[in-house]
Amino acid sequence: MVDELVLLLHALLMRHRALSIENSQLMEQLRLLVCERASLLRQVRPPSCPVPFPETFNGESSRLPEFIVQTASYMLVNENRFCNDAMKVAFLISLLTGEAEEWVVPYIEMDSPILGDYRAFLDEMKQCFGWDDDEDDDDDEEEDDY
């Protein structure tokens, strides 16, 4: 029984060494590929973006629709950079200044789930900075009453 355990332990140690060596080789290959990729990327000139970089948003309610359109357009043409909701929200946050930046700090401090949900983050911004999507619907209903 003890001999079997010793043999098993020896076999496991040998397997561990072999896997460690293989892992080291793979990590070296990965390092070389990352360096090669960086070198190739420096040689390639990225195409110019047809949509300008969005302006910052300071919390001024009248600018919120413009800010959302600018950022959405920019993210659409650069979709490879914004592959998930967390990246989109982080991009929006990077453009906030003043009152808007102060507004987002508590969400960051408590690591709110809203930071990983683009739609929810936009809805929260709209609610805070005074953009109501239902405004047009209410106007239509009032017109129907007359």
Curated annotation (Swiss-Prot):
May have an important role in the development and/or progression of some cancers. Pfam families: DUF4939 (PF16297). It comes from the Eukaryota. Belongs to the LDOC1 family. The lineage of its organism: Eukaryota, Metazoa, Chordata, Craniata, Vertebrata. It comes from Pan paniscus (Pygmy chimpanzee). The keyword Repeat does not apply. GO terms for biological process: cellular response to lipopolysaccharide; cellular response to muramyl dipeptide. It is found in: Nucleus. Keywords: Nucleus. InterPro entries: DUF4939. GO terms for cellular component: nucleus. This is Protein LDOC1. Interacts with NOD2.
